[in-house]
Each structure stands twice: as C-alpha cells, then as structure tokens.
C-alpha cells in the first residue's frame, strides 16, 4: 500500500541537504523537529512542555499543542507513515506518539537512528521496538546488537561549489566523541609524511586542543561548506567512533 509521509527530522544542514530530493514531493511533509513549531502560542506551550520543572501530567493545553502540530494536509487520502529521527523520541514525547496513534489509526510508525543508540541517553530500545512498526539504524553493528534493521545513511543529488582555496591531500571533519586520540595520531602520521591536511574538529575543549595553528577547532560548520572543502581535497578521512560500523556522511 502507498503512503503519504510525515518526517520528523532535524534542522541540521546535513539532514536538510540529504533529504532534499524528497522534500518537494506532494506525498512528503518534512519537519525540522518533532514539533515544527511555527507560531508564538504553540512555541510558548512547547517551551512549557520541555521545562524539567513541569511534569507531563501537569502540562496545561497539551491537547492544544498536539492539535496545532499534527494538522497534516495531503492531496489524497492515502494512509500516513510517520518517520521520526531517533533523537526526537524520548520520555517527554511518548504522549505525542500515542496521540498520533489515536488520531491516525491506519498509520504506520518508523524511527531511524542516525547515530549510535548508546549516544541517546534517554532511549529505551525495547520500548521503541514495541511501539514502532519499523526501527532502523545507520550502523550495521547497532542493527545486529539490538535486533533492528540496518539502513545506510541517505543522500540526495545536489550541486556543489568548490569555492576558492588550496587543494589539500586529506580532509577530516567531525566531533571527536570517543576517538580524539586516534584523530590526532592520524593527523601526526599524515603530516609527518608530507600530506597537506585540512582537519576540522568540533566541540573540543580549549585545554584539550593541540596543533592549534594547523587544526581548525570549531563549534560547527555549515554542511554546504563541508561539501565545498571536501571537493577541494584528494581524499576524505573516516575514523569511526568506538563500537560503530556505519559510515557517516562526510560528503
């Protein structure tokens, strides 16, 4: 059976780029979060909803928020498949999931983890498997570990501007997570062997930063800039975080 799709995604530059091929389809609604808050009233209720001082059961106007953010319109009456990114689903958002299930009884519900499940601190994977029709992971090991389906990171076809800059031999961009030592060792080995490197590390504390004249320590990078830098490099470096086997979207 064919479906219309509601994707509860992310406002991150990569995700909006990776899913751009389907965003303009009449059968797809892409939201940059679970809520897609777009007016002051629902934004205020949303803020109340996420304060740790207010338990779910005491939230005023909860149904008003749910109605405001679940008014989906398609050109036909096909059933809906709701696909959520993993970080959107946690204890605070379970009630909204049940609201959707009550109001869309013919719908299917899928969830896609695009990072290791262990990095989602509030995820009860057994609960997730009980309440979703389809559970996916970008990482092959995670899929095996938790008994869910493996699905590689999606991409869309987009034009890339190379921009202006010196061509590099090797390019790396990423948060260090649990691989800082391996990243620095790779940098040292490559530069000692004469390679021109463009290393960009995200969110590294100042006291931990080394080779600061040559390595770029940043808070974030627009995904289009990442693509531009990658296109000016001969090779991209992938260093998987520990326990991971799924490749990440370097370009």
What are these model-derived regions, one by one?
Residues 1-71, 75-77, 85-96, 114-251:
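Nucleotide-sugar donor-binding catalytic core of glycosyltransferases
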Residues 79-80, 107:
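Residue-level recognition of the N-termini of beta-strands and the immediately preceding loop/turn
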Residues 82-83, 110:
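Short, conserved beta-strand segments within well-ordered enzyme catalytic domains
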Residues 100-116:
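Active-site proximal beta-strand in glycosyltransferases
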